[in-house]
Regions:
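Conserved, structured core segments of small domains
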Residues: 1-118
């Protein structure tokens, strides 16, 4: 079954960009992604630009409204995702607990609906 890991953290949480700690964490991300791939469970994963690069679209009264930034102010921002294919929720949760920023952020795990199954 496929599961989406939605990776959240507070803006500014974690190591400072460019620091030795940041470089070390990036190596953890690369190793984690490689481990998912080597285990044959990685479908896809990407980092996202920050909320300052986001645009929200709402359609109201037949017209599209575009707003810079996310729809609502949030304490934690979505920073990326992984899509994995594993047998059980327990397997997904075990992999999610290993996401490098799980120690200062949060990982939301959601099963993906498979409409091809009828």
């Amino acid at each position: 079954m496929q599961y989406m890991f939605l990776i959240y953290s507070e803006p500014g949480a974690g190591p400072e960009m460019g620091s030795d700690e940041h470089q070390a964490e990036m190596q953890q991300w690369f190793a984690y992604t490689a481990a998912l791939g080597e285990a044959g469970v990685l479908v896809r994963g990407d980092a996202l630009h920050g909320t300052e690069a986001a645009t929200t679209v709402r359609v109201r009264d037949g017209g599209a409204l575009h707003t810079d930034g996310p729809f609502a102010e949030t304490k934690e921002a979505l920073g990326g995702y992984y899509l994995v294919d594993v047998p059980t929720l327990d397997d997904a949760l075990a992999w999610a607990a290993k996401v490098p920023n799980a120690g200062y952020g949060s990982i939301e795990v959601r099963p993906v609906v498979d409409f091809s199954q009828g």
